[in-house]
Amino acid sequence: MASNKYKSLNEKWDLYIPFIELGLQLLCTNGTFSMIVPYPLTNQKYGKKLRKIITEEYCLLEITDLNGTKVFENATVSNCIPFVQNCLPKEELRITHFFEGKTIQEVLRKSPETLKQDEKDYIWNLTREERTGTRFANMNVLGDFCYISKGMVLNANENVEKGAFKKEDLISDVYDKIHSRKYIEAKDIDKYQVKRVRYLEWNTERCPDKLSRPTFRELYDCSKLILNCLGTINVTIDKEEYFLHNHSIYCAVLWKDLKDINNKSISSSIKKFCRYNRIEMETLSGKVDLYYLLAILNSSIADELLADQRGGDYHIYPEHIRNLPIPLPEKEVQKNIGNIAKEILQRRKVNADYSDLQEELDKMVASLYQ
């Protein structure tokens, strides 16, 4: 892979990327290549170069969209099937779906130009919806206000004590001196709600210091938003409990609340993903209210903005969350929206209906994006 044989390798590329490029390289003139591959080929950064190669240097005949269709029993990632011919690009390509009765049928046609969602990320849009990753380009994004991180990976560090313990060995349903911190996973949360709490072994010889991915302790000792990484975005707030969580949950911590905490994770994130320096982001984060951000991320427009970022993918990746555009209205507007979020939180505690509040909130948030 160190040679220049593969032009498609980009960032943390997946193994199927060079296999696709190799298949294309081996084609004779007018030969055709197809492969069942992960759906993230259509929308992830690591696939950008390959998407560009396929649409500009070859003829993309068809893409079978298998998003949501279980092809491989034990796989968690959805799939797609590109059909690529070694000839000049044509004016149209077919988008096909898998239907009951195990038939694949055409649902729409697109030009290579309309397939492309935007120039920046070269995401393929396999739907009829108009999507663009450049909407509200003049707004701040969530990453300007918050440090975004996955949680811990709770098995033993592969380089230190591989196989010495697994996640289940560290979790208890009841509190004791060893399992001393409240712990949640993505399946334990919903919009504005934590549904279940368990307890994690903490400050022992093996946890967190011998974890595969321990993150850093201070991440869990401050106020934050917590959200899932699959499907519809569900966000709640952690202002008092300071839950520990695993990698199925992302957290968003205001930059100002990490002031004076310096480590490789933070510095690397700033270098790779941020357009402002740390001092500027700490200042910016002082201008937003965490309850306001909670309301924004749980609003109906957030679903639309997330679709702009991830295309049709079922997964939510940190870069999707980090790049969500966020309006910055006056403090009084933020307070009013945040107060509705607080009221919804109270209703969720007693499982009361909050649809009227959500409707009101959606209207208020939508007005900020007009």
Spans of model-derived segments:
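Short, flexible loop segments at the rims of nucleotide/cofactor-binding pockets, characterized by
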Residues: 11-12, 204-205, 347
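Polybasic, glycine- and aromatic-enriched phosphate-binding surface used to engage nucleic acids
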Residues: 17, 24-27, 130-332
